[in-house]
């Protein structure tokens, strides 16, 4: 487990049922962070892909995928394993590998936005599938971003991803997410790209995330949001739900929380009446406690999409039983 001072690390562990009485020991070695290990530098690409480059396979709109298929090696390595990773988990893993969780909030947000836009460009352009490969992205820093199997995730990075996971970076008149390349800025220099250490120093000086991004990528860069998130039953209503809120979105939330409560019985069930009262707030609070969200009883952006994610998960499990 990789830890930093004063930062909470979250280590995912998969428990498997053993068919024998004998215990087994199968350690997983987590690879080193990109800022202290020497990995191959990124091979430069155009930040906006042409149709000819992508093999003429391009999505009609920007979509947050349910799953990223990560090829655990160079694109041409046929022995590399392909891992199927939920989109947000992929972004959290890459960010935990590429930047330090101890950095200022603005630098974390700027880097995470660049990581997401980089990833969604690969998704939107079908970059590797257009070249005959059956995956979304690689784990090689020479071609893409560093993803490490079973990497420790840091709580503040996880929170920021939850808050802005539907965003990406755009330029006027360009549909595709900008392919925002970056480097560390110390061992490797990269003109017109963001440098990770440089973003940290700019945040120390008080610059915001968008100011940092424009410093490196130019004044025309702006933050955009997707309209479609794959696998999510209904989009965020555009405002927080709290005591006094009413309507179909509240009813949908109540129904989903009640379904989740079947698998997590410490969550109290509530009347699905479309009225956000104290009982609904209590159920949301318990949900937030279980899934490591800020415990407010208010259904904000992060809570809404976490409820949707868990709801989809438990209903899929039930279908497969």
Residue spans for each PLM region:
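Conserved, single-site charged/polar hotspot
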Residues: 1-321
């Amino acid at each position: 487990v990789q830890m930093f001072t004063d930062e909470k690390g979250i280590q995912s562990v998969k428990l498997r049922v053993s068919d024998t009485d004998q215990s087994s020991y199968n350690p997983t070695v987590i690879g080193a962070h990109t800022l202290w290990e020497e990995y191959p530098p990124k091979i430069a690409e155009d930040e906006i892909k042409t149709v000819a480059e992508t093999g003429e396979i391009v999505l009609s709109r920007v979509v947050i995928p349910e799953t990223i298929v990560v090829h655990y090696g160079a694109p041409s390595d046929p022995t590399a394993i392909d891992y199927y990773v939920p989109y947000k988990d992929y972004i959290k893993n890459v960010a935990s590998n590429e930047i330090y969780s101890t950095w200022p909030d603005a630098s974390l947000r700027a880097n995470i936005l660049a990581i997401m836009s980089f990833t969604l460009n690969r998704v939107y352009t079908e970059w590797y599938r257009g070249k005959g490969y059956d995956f979304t992205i690689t784990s090689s820093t020479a071609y893409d971003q560093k993803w490490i199997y079973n990497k420790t995730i840091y709580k503040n990075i996880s929170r920021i991803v939850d808050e802005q996971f539907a965003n990406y970076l755009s330029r006027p008149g360009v549909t595709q997410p900008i392919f925002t390349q970056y480097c560390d800025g110390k061992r490797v220099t990269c003109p017109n790209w963001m440098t990770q250490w440089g973003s940290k120093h700019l945040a120390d000086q008080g610059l915001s995330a968008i100011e940092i991004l424009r410093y490196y990528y130019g004044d025309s860069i702006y933050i955009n949001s997707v309209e479609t998130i794959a696998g999510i039953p209904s989009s965020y209503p555009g405002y927080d739900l709290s005591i006094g809120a009413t309507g179909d979105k509240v009813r949908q939330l109540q129904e989903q929380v009640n379904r989740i409560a079947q698998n997590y019985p410490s969550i109290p069930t509530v009347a699905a009446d479309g009225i956000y009262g104290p009982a609904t707030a209590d159920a949301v609070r318990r949900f937030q406690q279980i899934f490591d969200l800020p415990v407010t009883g208010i259904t904000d952006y992060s809570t809404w999409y976490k409820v949707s994610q868990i709801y989809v998960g438990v209903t899929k499990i039930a279908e497969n039983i």
